[in-house]
Structure formats: structure tokens, C-alpha cells
Regions:
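Short beta-strand element of the alpha/beta-hydrolase
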Residues: 80-91
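Residue-level detector of functionally pivotal "anchor" positions at catalytic/ligand-binding pockets or at interdomain
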Residues: 441-463, 469, 476-478, 491-492
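N-terminal cap/lid segment of alpha/beta-hydrolase-fold proteins
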Residues: 25-80
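C-terminal catalytic histidine-bearing segment of alpha/beta-hydrolase fold enzymes
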Residues: 294, 347-449
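Active-site-adjacent alpha-helix of alpha/beta-hydrolase-fold enzymes
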Residues: 104, 108, 302-388
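C-terminal tail/sorting-segment detector
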Residues: 23, 513-534
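Gly/Ser-rich "nucleophile elbow"/oxyanion-hole loop immediately N-terminal to the catalytic nucleophile
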Residues: 80, 143-156, 160-188, 200-209, ...
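Cap/lid segment of the alpha/beta-hydrolase catalytic domain
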Residues: 92-109, 122-152
Length: 534
């Protein structure tokens, strides 16, 4: 008899294991392990001129840009066309260590998120871009102009990266990428990159606004002299936002770097990369950062998902001034549109319609929508509410809670970020949980079938609803497996598993009055609905 029960237990265990495996879905769940992931570091995707390479290192000169590739090993994964997510790091557009401990494609946060995407079956790419600007200049034109130029060149690099990725997928596709689905994710400064990448599409957008013009005659950001009213960006020198035009005159090859030498007495300083390959993307995501100007956004831009700290001192949540920290001082740069403003524009314009976020009733979606700072209950923005520990010192707020770094770094833990890996990983959990359902919707628009969790061919009835004492949840045509209930802030108030019945009674008498989100898992899928306690 004992052996019989042991055998039955083993069979049940195997069935449960089989159910858990079959319930996992590629692109939604982590279907690969860390051991299954291959990393290809330091792959060059493009080259271009940088005027901020120090003379001690041979600058100004042409430099390479790198990306690290994270993907399920092709000996394990049989999928031949895998969607791509390209990540861009933070660092205030300055070399690592000048403004923060972050500043390249190997930053902890972008590496962690790249690995998480790869374990879900994506090809994830962490990319560098050109850095450098006169962040602490006392000349407003030089400070503001070089900052705009830094964003501009980073967009050119990002487009070169997308073209390199798509071009590789179209030619030999050794990394088995889908050229028809590429998403971008920017962290901190990388958020400025993804915003500008998605919205900047004509010269007038950087030439016409007064804030992007010289306020006085004097030295220009590319050398020489300029007049008041001239635009900071000169496409004859640096090319357009796609990285075309303004071509440099090549005079030879550096014996040190092996890269082209250019004639700095000539006007052009741009080197086009992967010309002719399309650079359009399917989705952009920002964790912090801002939109350089709200007028950049227009109908037809790619859908956008945003994450932002409400009290971010360095990049505004609504609208406001960009502030950059250098050596304990803060330098104001330019007024921009924050993530909340950008999300509202993208929602109203219809760009985010494809994400269908208003139908999502999971705890993270409900919490994001109902956040008290989210004026208008905008979709597709997740707000973090951390306050600075001292309201008189707003610059101490933790505006990048997903970042952590080497504890031995000279710029180590502070009140602004305690540099606790476990805490940062928890914030990344939230970022992934909010991103994945929306990423799935964008993928479905490109021909995938992701996240089809809710199946409409069975009915769930909750009665009475509103409820004051108890309610009965009944299913028609299916068996209820579990029920979970959370409030509008995403806090769990009720969980019951292993039900295996077509109905279940829930006592609501002790609950506070309000609206609750009920998630019912059945043997034919999941339904999410509302329950009101009156």
C-alpha cells in the first residue's frame, strides 16, 4: 500500500512538473537558464568621429562603438528569427566616473535586463554610443549646445546600431534575429536616446526652437565663430539625425587604431554607417530620461513605455529643467518634456493604441494607472514615488533605483542611491513585469502570438457585484483552479489555490469599501475582472 501511494505521489508530481513547464510561454517567461545564454562581448557595430577624445589619447579622432550580444545559445534554441531588444546605458553622456559610476554597455542594470530578455528568448544587445560634452562650462551656449550635440550623435549611433543589427539579420543571420522586430530600451541618459530616436525626424525640430539656438555671437560648439540665432546643430558638419550627410574627408588610416583619419580642415566630420538599411523600430522604452522637446513627438512614432521617478531631480517627470551633477555641483542645461508629458502625447496621438494597455488589469497595470501623481491616469507610464530624505535637498532623491555598481568605485553609495543590489533587482522585477505584456502586444502587431493568456470562450460570473458580505464566483464551461484578489494599489487581499470547482464563495465583509481586481485561473485560461465592495 505504501508503494502504491508513493507511485501515485510520483505520478502527481510529474504531472505538476509537466503542467508548470507547458504553462511557460516564450517571450513572457524565462524559458532559458543563465547557463543557456551566450554572450558575445565587444562586437563593433560602427565608427564615427568624436571631438571629445582627449589629446593624450590621440583625439579628436574616429572611434569605434561596441555592443555586447546576449542570446540563447544557438545549439540549444532552434528558433531562427528571434526578436531583438537593444539597450542603451546611462551616465549623463559623459565617460564613466565623471558624473556617475555608470556610463557604458557593461553597466549592471543594462546587463541584468539584457540577460532577462535573453532568458525569455530574445536576442538582447547592450550598446555603447559616443560620449562627451562641456557639462560644466559657464557659457550657457556651450553647455546647452554640446549637450544637444551629444544627444544628437547618440541617436546617430543608435541608428547605426539598429541598421547593423537589421543588416546582419538580412544577410547571414548567424545570431538568428528577426529583422522585422527591434525594440529599444534606454536607461537614464539612454532614455533621452530612445525618446529622440523615436521622435526626431526633421531638421526644423532642432533648428527652430529658441532653446536650441545660440543666444550670443561667439565660439561655436564645433569651433569657429557663430552669430546669435544660429542653430546649435549644423548638419553640414555632423550630418542629419539618421547619420547621413556631413561626410568627413578621409585622408588615410591611423597606424595606432586602424581606423580612418579625417581632414579636420574640411567641413564634414560624419562617417555614415550601414547606409541604406532601414532604421525603423517597433517599440521604445525609457527608464528616466526625457523628450528634448514636446514638438518632436507626432502621430506615427513608435509606441512608447515609460518608467520615471516622480521626484527625479535630474530629468523632470512632467516638464522642467535638466540638471547634470559634476563634482558635487549641479549645472542646469535645458527645459524638456518629461515621461508623463511624453506618455500623454503618445497616448492621445494613437501611437500607443497597439499596446492595448487600458484592458490590462494585472496588479502592476492597476497600480501604475491609479498612481496619485499620474494625472489623467495615463497608460504606459509606471511612476515611482520615492521622496528625497530631506525635502530641502531634492537632489538626494533616488531617481535611478534600478542601478547598482562596484562598491569599490570612488563614486559609491549615497543618499541618492544606496547601491543595494537586492533593492535594484526588485525594481528591475517591476520594470520587466510592466514591460513584458506591452512588449507582447507590440510583437503581436508584427505577427507574433504572445501573451494570449485571456481566452474569451468561457464565462465567469461574480454575483452579487457590488458585494457587501460575500459573493459567488461561478465558471461556465471550465473549472476554477485559483482565485486571487488585489486592491487598486496592487496589494493582495485574498488568494485561494487548488480549488478545482466550478464555483467558489468569497467573504468580502471585512474588506474596505472600494474596487478590487479579481484574477481567476481556470483549466482553459485566465480571466481578470473587477469586484466592488460597497
Amino acid at each position: 500500500m505504501k508503494n502504491l501511494y508513493s507511485l501515485k505521489s510520483l505520478v502527481i508530481l510529474l504531472l505538476l512538473i509537466n503542467f508548470n513547464v507547458s504553462a511557460q510561454q516564450r517571450y513572457v517567461d524565462e524559458v532559458f537558464t543563465d547557463a543557456d545564454i551566450t554572450v558575445l562581448p565587444g562586437v563593433i557595430y560602427g565608427i564615427n568621429f568624436s571631438q571629445y577624445v582627449p589629446a593624450a589619447f590621440g583625439g579628436p579622432q574616429v572611434i569605434p562603438q561596441y555592443h555586447d550580444i546576449y542570446m540563447p545559445d544557438t545549439s540549444i534554441d532552434t528558433e531562427t528569427a528571434r526578436p531583438v531588444v537593444i539597450l542603451f546605458h546611462t551616465g549623463s553622456f559623459l565617460p564613466q566616473g565623471l558624473a556617475s559610476p555608470m556610463g557604458n554597455e557593461k553597466d549592471s542594470a543594462v546587463v541584468e535586463m539584457a540577460r532577462r530578455f535573453a532568458k525569455r528568448g530574445f536576442v538582447a544587445i547592450s550598446a555603447s554610443y559616443r560620449l562627451g560634452w562641456l557639462a560644466n562650462s559657464t557659457n550657457l551656449d556651450l553647455r546647452r549646445g554640446t549637450n544637444l550635440a551629444a544627444v544628437y550623435s547618440s541617436v546617430q549611433d543608435a541608428k547605426a546600431c539598429v541598421r547593423a543589427t537589421r543588416g546582419r539579420a538580412l544577410v547571414n543571420n548567424a545570431w538568428r534575429m528577426d529583422p522585422n522586430f527591434i525594440a529599444l530600451m534606454g536607461v537614464g541618459s539612454g532614455g533621452y536616446v530612445t525618446f529622440a530616436y523615436n521622435t526626431l525626424d526633421n531638421y526644423a525640430e532642432v533648428a527652430n526652437p529658441t532653446k536650441f539656438k545660440y543666444t550670443a555671437a561667439g565660439p561655436g560648439i564645433y569651433g569657429g565663430t557663430v552669430s546669435a540665432g544660429d542653430p546649435y546643430i549644423d548638419t553640414a558638419i555632423v550630418g542629419d539625425w539618421d547619420g547621413y550627410g556631413g561626410e568627413a574627408t578621409i585622408t588615410g588610416t591611423s597606424t595606432v587604431t586602424g581606423l580612418p583619419l579625417i581632414d579636420l580642415t574640411q567641413t564634414g566630420r560624419n562617417i555614415p554607417n550601414h547606409a541604406g538599411v532601414p532604421s525603423d523600430v517597433n517599440l521604445v522604452i525609457n527608464l528616466g530620461g526625457a523628450l528634448g522637446d514636446s514638438a518632436w513627438a507626432s502621430s506615427g512614432d513608435a509606441p512608447t513605455i515609460s518608467f520615471h521617478s516622480r521626484y527625479d531631480f535630474f530629468a523632470p517627470y512632467y516638464r522642467g529643467m535638466v540638471n547634470v551633477p559634476i563634482a558635487g555641483a549641479f549645472f542646469p542645461v535645458v527645459e524638456v518634456a518629461g515621461s508623463h508629458t511624453a506618455a500623454k502625447i503618445s497616448n492621445i496621438s494613437g501611437n500607443n493604441t497597439v499596446l492595448a494597455s487600458s484592458t490590462m488589469m494585472d496588479p502592476h497595470s492597476v497600480k501604475a494607472r491609479s498612481n496619485s501623481y499620474n494625472i489623467g491616469n495615463q497608460e504606459n507610464i509606471y511612476t515611482f514615488n520615492m521622496l528625497p530624505p530631506n525635502l530641502a535637498m531634492p537632489f538626494l532623491v533616488n531617481s535611478n533605483p534600478w542601478d547598482w555598481w562596484d562598491a569599490n568605485d570612488p563614486l559609491t553609495a549615497s543618499q541618492a542611491n544606496p547601491n543595494i543590489k537586492a533593492q535594484s533587482m526588485s525594481y528591475i522585477d517591476t520594470v520587466m513585469a510592466y514591460t513584458i505584456p506591452r512588449l507582447g502586444k507590440a510583437m503581436n502587431a508584427a505577427g507574433y502570438s504572445v501573451g494570449a493568456e485571456e481566452i474569451p470562450d468561457f464565462n465567469i460570473l461574480i454575483s452579487p457585484n457590488p458585494s457587501s458580505y460575500s459573493c459567488l464566483i461561478s465558471s461556465q464551461g471550465t473549472t476554477i483552479r485559483s482565485v486571487s484578489v488585489c486592491d487598486v494599489l496592487g496589494r493582495p487581499v485574498y488568494v485561494l489555490k487548488n480549488i478545482q470547482s466550478s464555483q467558489i464563495e468569497i467573504l468580502t465583509e471585512s474588506w474596505a469599501r472600494g474596487t478590487y481586481i479579481v484574477r481567476i485561473e481556470t483549466d482553459r485560461g485566465v480571466k481578470t475582472t473587477k469586484l466592488v465592495r460597497n
